[in-house]
């Protein structure tokens, strides 16, 4: 696996989180498997490669890849506007987080507690989701830049959905951090679109 593929997997994780946030906001539903994959990505330590962060299978990121392709192709018929907005916001928030060592320490200290809960209850248990959402609320949601989630108020006002959305945003920002650590830059999305798309098309063939 080359470095660009590693970057695209991490970026696919950002977009996967964005797609799931949009899905919950609009319909109140997202599969437990998809949510579990993203929550699990918060807890992976010392992965052998980037794909292992997301369960070791490209299929787990299929929806994220599709949204990323739609953004890079700039085709109005395939562009998922809200997921793109959420993804770009997560990339921006990660840059702010990187300047906040105190906030990184809080996140680093509380993730082992969430790991213990996940070991006891399972990844998608309401306690694990609530703790992950609370960690986002106590840290990233206090930054100047905020992510405004749009959708159906019937679903957004449900506490369980709000926790899922916050937990997914935390996971997406973790993926954004990984992307940047692998050498990813926002200008690539503008100036290296063709190169990224060529690599993505090949990666997506294994998920269809």
Swiss-Prot record:
Superkingdom of the source species: Bacteria
Keyword annotations: Cell inner membrane, Cell membrane, Cytoplasm, Membrane
Signal sequence, start to end: none
Record localization: Cytoplasm; Cell inner membrane
Membrane topology: Peripheral membrane protein
Gene3D superfamilies the UniProt entry points to: HflD-like
GO cellular component: cytoplasm; plasma membrane
Major subcellular location class: cytoplasm
PANTHER family xrefs: HIGH FREQUENCY LYSOGENIZATION PROTEIN HFLD
Entry similarity comment: Belongs to the HflD family.
Record-linked NCBIfam families: PRK00218.1-2 (NF001246), PRK00218.1-3 (NF001247)
UniProt name for this protein: High frequency lysogenization protein HflD homolog
Organism: Pseudomonas entomophila (strain L48)
Source species taxonomy: Bacteria, Pseudomonadati, Pseudomonadota, Gammaproteobacteria, Pseudomonadales
Gene that encodes it: hflD
